[in-house]
Amino acid sequence: MKSVCMVALGTMLVIVCGSSLLSAQEYDFDENSRLNTNIAIPVVAPVNPTARFTNFGVGFTAGAGYNMSPRNAFVGEFMWNRLFPSNSAITPLRLALHSRSLKGYGNLLAFTGNYKFELRGKSLGTYFIGGGGFYYRSVTLSQEVVTGTAIACTPEWVFWGFVCSSGVVSSDQTLANTSSAAPGFNAGMGFTIKVGEPRYRLYFEARYHYAATTPANTQLIPITFGIRF
């Protein structure tokens, strides 16, 4: 529920910011407009150590910002990704419960401020983008897991938020979800293709994201497909 609320809050902030920028425009919506917006669907490719626990992810990205010049812009973005754990990340818990029905998933939310440098032609363009912000990651199990004794502490147990001591998982822990929030940064590049007036452009982007979440940091590369205005 908390993750759903944050997704809704992030989307609302993007809409409000975009509306404020829109109402403040003194220019027509041509190639020289001061407003920039984007909406897209990212497909996530995790990078180690995240790749050890997650196969892939998919989500939603929306942003709005201010064009300082034709090449330089500020972009505020909200990103949400649903992360799907690998079998190896959940197998130790299934073995401990003697249940193959146990499932899990993760949510990653990010609020970032970014600088974009763009080289735009009449039809094609390319850009570099990077910045920083706040990242929130949560992982949830389909049922509570109660730890017993003498369970070897592996990174998979730590990923789900369990505490270890002297090389074993501490006994009598009951856990169904855990979360971590941390600052982070991102950097990447993309390509644009003009598809309509006044300046709609499809964009394809790859951007590396890092956040110092615990117990394992978050590293991933969303491959994003969307439209910029």
Language model segments and positions:
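Outer-membrane beta-barrel biogenesis signature
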Residues: 14-38
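Residues that define the transmembrane beta-barrel architecture of outer-membrane proteins
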Residues: 33, 54-58, 105-111, 124, ...
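Flexible, solvent-exposed coil segments and beta strand-coil junctions
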Residues: 38-44, 88-97, 163-172, 200-206
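Predominantly the C-terminal beta-signal and adjacent terminal strand-loop region
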Residues: 83-85, 177, 190-229
